[in-house]
């Protein structure tokens, strides 16, 4: 059997002898061993367990849902200390079956065995402990409390853990249901949100102040914070796009202006004749200045000499010299200018000016025929055919009928071509003959015996 006894009792040796006589094994600690483990709760330094927890960067910044904390607090407050009462187990219930559990002696010893009554009697004969009555009673109370706590701890811990788990499940369900509720940001609600943000400033707006300005009870600070983050991100994106569009517009203007330093190109003239594949017409040459001879011209070898009295002097002394010729001015464009000219008018002798109409060059009429050249056939003169005189109406009708109904020679020639080349398609206007027409033509020509059609 097993007997447990504390080291506080002075008559441990006597009790060991009694237990040995009874055939039981006593487990305990001697006074020498107890001196080595003599410590109290005050000697334990709890600061080592929370070492370096005062630093802010050690613990992560966890998001704690206030709904869960408040739900736990409300559950504890409504229970009214039921958890504490569950842990308190009456001593009578534990010590009632003394025959099965054992006897509690004045020193707080528990004896487990069949002869526990005799062991308790032997303990009473010894006269108890040699300590004071007050100390003995205190030890008895401490031992009873320890036994009660040890025996009641499994059941009480199980019940309290089950209740805590059920409360946590209920609170998590309620908080989970609250988190799933989403806010429908209608255009009116978003407009009020934007007004509140603009009133506070985009950089100084905080969710609590926005919620106060909006004054809507269905919104929470978490909803405002989430929408504010999305609004700032969208606004930043739009500002970046506007800046990029402005930069592109500025670059396009700079390129269109030629970099700013180049002068603006003159507008193209709408009356310019388009030239496709031909160089632009050269500018008209300036009018040559008249040559003035103020002295006697030099004699050229081989030319006859002239009488100096007959040599004309230029300019004459009685005439006033003319001024410079006025610059050439192009003629005004006509009302319907041409936009194309024939290639033969591109020569230097026929350079079209601005607004020259497109018309054919007139052919000069030959007054006299060219003299015949031996060995060359003369070019025949083009003469248009004179239209015939208008005939009577009967002649015109007959001519139209002839034109509509071809002649028999042309029909025979076409039929001969078809018969000689049967693999070619029929010429335009010919159709394959029908059976009725062929039979009628044969009967008309006197052919009576016609073989039946094959197939």
Swiss-Prot record:
Residues 177-236 form the HTH myb-type domain. GO terms for cellular component: nucleus. One of its GO terms (biological process) is positive regulation of DNA-templated transcription. InterPro entries: GLK1/2-like, Homeodomain-like_sf, Myb_dom, Myb_dom_plants, SANT/Myb. Residues 145-183 are annotated as: Disordered. It comes from Oryza sativa subsp. japonica. This is Probable transcription factor GLK1. NCBIfam families: myb_SHAQKYF (TIGR01557). PANTHER family: TRANSCRIPTION ACTIVATOR GLK1 (PTHR31312), TRANSCRIPTION FACTOR GLK1-RELATED (PTHR31312:SF3). Residues 169-181 have a biased composition (Basic residues). Pfam families: Myb_DNA-binding (PF00249). GO terms for molecular function: DNA-binding transcription factor activity; transcription cis-regulatory region binding. Expressed in leaves. Residues 145-163 have a biased composition (Low complexity). Keywords: DNA-binding, Nucleus, Transcription, Transcription regulation. Induction: By light. Residues 207-232 bind DNA. It is found in: Nucleus. Probable transcriptional activator that promotes chloroplast development. Acts as an activator of nuclear photosynthetic genes involved in chlorophyll biosynthesis, light harvesting, and electron transport.
């Amino acid at each position: 059997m097993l007997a447990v006894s504390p080291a506080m009792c002075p008559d441990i040796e006597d009790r060991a002898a009694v237990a040995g006589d009874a055939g039981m094994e006593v487990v305990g600690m001697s006074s020498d061993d107890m001196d080595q483990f003599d410590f109290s709760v005050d000697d334990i330094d709890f600061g080592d367990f929370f070492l370096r927890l005062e630093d802010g960067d050690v613990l992560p910044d966890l998001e704690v849902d206030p709904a869960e904390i408040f739900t736990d607090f409300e559950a504890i407050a409504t229970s009214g200390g039921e958890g504490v009462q569950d842990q308190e187990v009456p001593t009578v219930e534990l010590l009632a079956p003394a025959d099965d559990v054992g006897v509690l002696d004045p020193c707080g010893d528990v004896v487990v065995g069949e002869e526990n009554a005799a062991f308790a009697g032997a303990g009473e004969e010894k006269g108890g402990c040699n300590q004071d009555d007050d100390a003995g009673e205190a030890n008895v109370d401490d031992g009873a409390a320890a036994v009660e706590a040890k025996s009641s701890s499994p059941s009480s811990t199980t019940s309290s853990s089950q209740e805590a788990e059920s409360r946590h499940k209920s609170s998590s369900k309620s908080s989970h249901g609250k988190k799933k509720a989403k806010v429908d940001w209608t255009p009116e609600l978003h407009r009020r949100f934007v007004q509140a943000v603009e009133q506070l400033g985009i950089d100084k707006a905080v969710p609590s102040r926005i919620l106060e300005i909006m004054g809507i009870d269905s919104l929470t600070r978490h909803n405002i914070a989430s929408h504010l983050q999305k609004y700032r991100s969208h606004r930043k994106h739009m500002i970046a796009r506007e800046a990029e569009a402005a930069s592109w517009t500025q670059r396009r203007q700079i390129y269109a202006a030629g970099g700013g330093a180049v002068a603006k190109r003159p507008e193209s003239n709408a009356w310019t004749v388009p030239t496709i594949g031909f160089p632009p017409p050269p500018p008209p040459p300036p009018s040559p200045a008249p040559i003035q001879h103020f002295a006697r011209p030099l004699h050229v070898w081989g030319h006859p000499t002239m009488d100096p009295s007959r040599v004309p002097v230029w300019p004459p002394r009685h005439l006033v010299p003319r001024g410079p010729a006025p610059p050439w001015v192009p003629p005004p464009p006509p009302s319907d200018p041409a936009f194309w000219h024939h290639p033969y008018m591109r020569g230097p002798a026929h350079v079209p000016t601005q607004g020259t109409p497109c018309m054919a060059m007139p052919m000069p009429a030959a007054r006299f025929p060219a003299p015949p050249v031996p060995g060359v056939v003369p070019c025949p003169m083009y003469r248009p055919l004179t239209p015939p005189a208008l005939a009577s109406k009967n002649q015109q009708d007959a001519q139209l009928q002839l034109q509509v109904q071809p002649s028999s020679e042309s029909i025979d020639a076409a039929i001969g071509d078809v018969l000689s080349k049967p693999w070619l398609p029929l010429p335009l206007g010919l159709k394959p003959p029908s059976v009725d027409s062929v039979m009628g033509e044969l009967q008309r020509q006197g052919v009576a015996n016609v073989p039946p059609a094959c197939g």
